[in-house]
């Protein structure tokens, strides 16, 4: 199963890393969840391997982590929508890939590394397809144009428990709003 949530708030995006990822698995005290970069876009920015907090936060702030340059024209401005102030720019999309509960139980309670490896392979296959259809919308002169980029900048974080501390194998993909 895949669920998705849009992250608009820069403050929430910044605190997400600090609260849930940098300090460890948000479900198990003392555990550290090391994220890993994914995507052609990440590679083109020189991002590979383990995610460093400074790089993640720079991207959330629309900055190239290597050079400090602004990545997109739109900044995190706000607009009025339905009487509420709303951010103009999406910081990232949070996709969560979860196998059925029975698969999590077999993988984690029986400590079956083959099932965890199968989950990881399935994620990689899904993400290759995900990236093949990656697109961005360009707005110019009051008209929208969708452009296929075939690249993403994303962080992958695999967890093995739910917030209730139940066995729950799942991988969070934070697809940042950057196309290069």
Language-model features: locations:
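Intrinsically disordered, flexible peripheral segments
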Residues: 1-169, 174-180
């Amino acid at each position: 199963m895949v669920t998705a949530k849009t992250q608009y708030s820069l403050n929430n995006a910044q605190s997400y890393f600090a609260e849930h990822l940098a300090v460890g698995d948000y479900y198990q005290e003392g555990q550290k969840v090391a994220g890993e970069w994914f995507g052609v876009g990440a590679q083109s920015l020189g991002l590979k391997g383990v995610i460093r907090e400074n790089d993640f936060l720079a991207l959330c702030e629309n900055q190239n982590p290597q050079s400090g340059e602004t990545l997109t024209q739109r900044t995190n401005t706000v607009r009025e929508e339905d009487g509420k102030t709303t951010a103009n720019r999406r910081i990232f999309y949070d996709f969560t890939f979860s196998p059925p509960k029975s698969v999590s139980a077999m993988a984690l309670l029986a400590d079956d590394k083959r099932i965890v490896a199968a989950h990881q392979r399935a994620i990689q296959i899904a993400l290759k397809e995900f990236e093949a259809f990656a697109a961005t919308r360009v707005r110019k002169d009051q008209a929208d144009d969708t452009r296929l980029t075939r690249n993403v900048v994303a962080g992958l974080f695999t967890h093995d428990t739910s917030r209730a501390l139940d066995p729950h194998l799942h991988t969070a993909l934070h697809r940042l709003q950057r196309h290069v």
